[in-house]
Amino acid sequence: MRLRAAVSALAVPVLLLAGCGQGAGPSPTSASGAVGSAGVSDSAGSDSAGSDSAAASSEAPTPGPTVPPETAVAAPVPADQLPTATGKIGEKPAFSFPKTSPPPSLQRQILVQGSGQEVKKGDWLITNYLGQVWGGKIFDNSYDRKKTTAFQIGVGKVVPGWDVAMAGVKVGSRILLSLPPADGYTSAGNSQAGIKGTDTIVFVVDILESIPADKGGQADAKPVPLPATTAVTVSGKLGVQPSVKIGPKATEPTKAQVLRLSIGTGAKLALDDQVLVQYQAVTWTNQPAVSTWPAANAAPQNPGGKGPEQITVQKDSPFAALAGITVGSRVLLLLPKTKSAQGESPAFAVIIDIVAKT
């Protein structure tokens, strides 16, 4: 079943911030950075007095602490041992660094306390951010691009310091992070971004939205019945995982086609928009193909990394038909069979929930 190839060929890989703009942000860890499973204690601690500090071991020769699984939040370093950052949420910050050496532990400081929901592992975050080497150059920022960045935390898709430090923060917050090497790019560094294996890296992050891994389209969207001639049955309430069945009289599609199942109240999509979607698919012979929806018995932190996937409404692709569809909607995407050097891929019926525009 090659639906994932058909979809993923057009899907934007999870934005790991490494390939954005000219620089590189919190990309996935390498094999040497085996700290991607690090967690956060159930108690987020208090950030109002300064910073949170992740407990760490100091096994040589790692040039920074190794964050153990399920690390507890340690006592913060004094505030004057961390950089200061100018600006309000939405404004590009500027760092001023102290003359002291970087702290050897993961530090988090709440610069502006938000009032939204708490971020949980497995959530997708929509953010603005700026990353800079301690006392050195800026290697990436979204403010100059004037475009937010989305990524999933707690599942090993970003550097471990982000996986750990984002959890427990409230939406609407601006935070400062200081990541020693083991919590960033480890001893390997990131040569493309100009980050050495001994560098501490710091970030300001504006957390604008948090999207749970099981979030679908709008539960109160306006339903739209399928034409009877479609001979495809879609079951399940709006906003939760659906199911789809191809009837015996259904005509196999010869081109990509989108049929509305509900109309959300969000913004209309346009070509080149990036969006988060949930999808559930079957082949034209009703064989289960692929789904982004987390399993019903999945752990709360969503360790498998399932959940919304980011795609581009790209011209000359099946997703081009999503242009004009509103965020919050549910649609049925019919994909014809295709042939390639790898063989033939069957026709598919895909239920897509448009979760958010990023």
Please give the residue ranges for each predicted region.
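Cross-family detector of peptidyl-prolyl cis-trans isomerase
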Residues: 2-358
